[in-house]
């Protein structure tokens, strides 16, 4: 097998990222050396490769599904939206400019060459490359400069399958309309369809499946059922829109080397085990919300997003996550009354955790002539930290031990340089952070994925809240692998894998019909 495949979608959040990961997992289990690829990604959730390059979080997840190390070539162009309708342009893992929509256009020709070089490189080193499109391939206002969808497919001669989300409704219109808006050369690369997130008996779809095949002259390669609990690495605001209500995870993922947690000192409530409630403030420019994934699979922990002060009232822990625009989100917190609510929590010794940008916001002052141009502004003053923004972004994976001797790993993606000032009540937190009373902060993303550290911290939170809660021996890495296996199972069980193999080996079949707009 030697080839590539592009997974396009009728819209954002149609299921491209998950289907790409599932195909990678299925192929890897079949013994195929496979890599993911996304030419251009727009996301605030990013990951850091072993050599310190920044790529989209979804591509790192897909690489994990494929069983390979993520690298910059898998996502050569990353756009990270910020304030004032500008985005940070990251090329081959390094930030190169702040651009708006019009300012981005002059870069496209040079970026197209980089994209194709990266794809050629991957195709030379792997048996198969599964490419993920961006948004919809039928964005006709963008087609002339497209480097992520049909522009990529045509330049690299990639067969294309288009996935549509039936759970949102209108999937057949979306599939047919997508094809009809493409020109003849682009249509010639579209090899078939996948229906995603179907609830119910797939036999009920048969009349529609046969009709869309007749209308387009292209087969439906599978109907993927709706499946709860896949939570894997949300990428953007559309993913967060589907964030579940606060329900505790019911099943533990046992960690083979887990030891009893000495920090667990739950209050006595007659033996009843209570739920620990976590509220994550949904900042307007929230980034790397994947930091809370480890809590979402922790049995007995209920995680929800919050945007109002009253939504923090019953939370045992409030998390202030990362942000692409620290000063702007600090101002938003003040306007919404959330800054005052956090100060009240701190005064009442109720736990608050800041991660990266959230840690900076909890500090005393922020000096920012880089990200917002705001100069010096006061933070919330809950931690003795001064943040100074630097044009050079800190990128890298980190490893250390905390004050208790527990090994920690994480990663950094930030422009802010932090100075911890003297405070009579401060103590170290995690590997790099500080804690004053119930308020703590760290610059490291991924710190809660460390099982022993997470158990100890949740035990402290439970004690502060007076909850009868004992952390489970959850192994987050194993939980992630099980969910990646579930994606591979969905592909193996519900897609025409023989057709996928033929597309990878032979490309799009010749002679597929052209469907003009208005055809029926």
UniProtKB/Swiss-Prot annotation:
Q: Which residues form the GATase cobBQ-type domain?
A: 275-453
Cross-referenced PROSITE patterns, in alphabetical order? GATASE_COBBQ
Which Pfam family would be a valid example here? CbiA
- List the signal peptide residues: none
Q: Does the keyword Calcium apply?
A: no
Q: Which pathway, metabolic or otherwise, does it act in?
A: Cofactor biosynthesis; adenosylcobalamin biosynthesis
InterPro entries noted in UniProt? Class_I_gatase-like, CobQ/CobB/MinD/ParA_Nub-bd_dom, CobQ_GATase1, CobQ_N, CobQ_synth, GATase_3, P-loop_NTPase
Q: Which CDD domains match?
A: CobQ_N, GATase1_CobQ
Q: Give one GO biological process term.
A: cobalamin biosynthetic process
What's this protein's family per the entry? Belongs to the CobB/CobQ family. CobQ subfamily.
Query: What is this protein's name?
Result: Cobyric acid synthase
């Amino acid at each position: 097998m030697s080839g590539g495949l592009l997974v396009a979608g009728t819209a954002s959040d149609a299921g491209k990222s998950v289907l790409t990961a599932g195909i990678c997992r299925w192929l890897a289990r079949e013994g195929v050396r496979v890599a993911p690829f996304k030419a251009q990604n727009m996301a605030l959730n990013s990951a850091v490769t072993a050599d310190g390059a920044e790529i989209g979080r979804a591509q790192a997840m897909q690489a994990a599904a494929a069983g390979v190390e993520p690298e910059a070539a898998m996502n050569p162009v990353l756009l990270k939206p910020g304030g004032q309708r500008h985005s940070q342009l990251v090329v081959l893992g390094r930030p190169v400019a702040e651009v708006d929509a019009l300012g981005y256009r002059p870069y496209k020709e040079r970026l197209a060459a980089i994209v194709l070089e990266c794809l050629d490189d991957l195709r030379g080193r792997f048996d198969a490359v599964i490419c993920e499109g961006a948004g919809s391939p039928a964005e006709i206002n963008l087609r002339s400069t497209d480097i992520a969808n049909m522009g990529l497919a045509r330049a690299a001669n990639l067969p294309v399958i288009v996935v549509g989300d039936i759970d949102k409704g209108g999937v057949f219109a979306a599939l047919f309309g997508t094809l009809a808006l493409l020109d003849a050369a682009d249509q010639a690369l579209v090899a078939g369809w996948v229906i995603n997130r179907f609830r119910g008996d797939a036999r009920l779809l048969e009349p529609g499946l046969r009709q869309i095949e007749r209308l387009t002259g292209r087969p439906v390669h599978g109907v993927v059922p709706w499946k709860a609990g896949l939570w894997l690495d949300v990428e953007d605001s559309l993913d967060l829109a589907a964030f579940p209500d606060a329900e505790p995870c019911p099943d533990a993922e046992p960690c083979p080397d887990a030891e009893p947690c000495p920090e667990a000192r739950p209050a006595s409530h007659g033996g009843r085990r209570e739920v620990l409630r976590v509220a994550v403030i949904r900042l307007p420019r929230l980034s790397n919300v994947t930091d809370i994934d480890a809590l979402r699979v922790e049995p007995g922990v209920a995680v929800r997003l919050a945007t109002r002060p009253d939504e923090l009232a019953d939370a045992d822990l409030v998390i202030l996550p990362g942000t692409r625009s620290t000063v702007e989100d600090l101002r938003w917190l003040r306007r919404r009354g959330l800054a005052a609510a956090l100060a009240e929590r701190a005064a009442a010794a109720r736990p608050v955790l800041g991660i990266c940008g959230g840690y900076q916001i909890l500090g005393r002052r922020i000096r920012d002539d880089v990200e917002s141009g705001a100069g010096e502004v006061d933070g919330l003053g809950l931690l003795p930290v001064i943040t100074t923004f630097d044009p050079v972004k800190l990128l890298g994976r980190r490893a250390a031990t905390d004050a208790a001797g527990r090994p920690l790993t994480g990663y950094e993606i930030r422009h802010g340089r932090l100075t911890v000032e003297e405070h009579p009540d401060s103590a170290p937190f995690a590997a790099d952070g500080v804690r004053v009373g119930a308020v703590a902060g760290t610059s490291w993303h991924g710190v809660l994925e460390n099982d022993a550290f997470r158990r100890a911290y949740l035990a402290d939170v439970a004690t502060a809240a007076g909850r009868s809660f004992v952390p489970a021996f959850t192994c987050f890495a194993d939980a992630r692998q099980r969910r990646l296996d579930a994606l591979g199972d969905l592909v193996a069980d519900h897609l025409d894998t023989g057709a996928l193999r033929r597309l990878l080996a032979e490309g799009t079949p010749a002679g597929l019909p052209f469907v003009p707009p208005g055809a029926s």
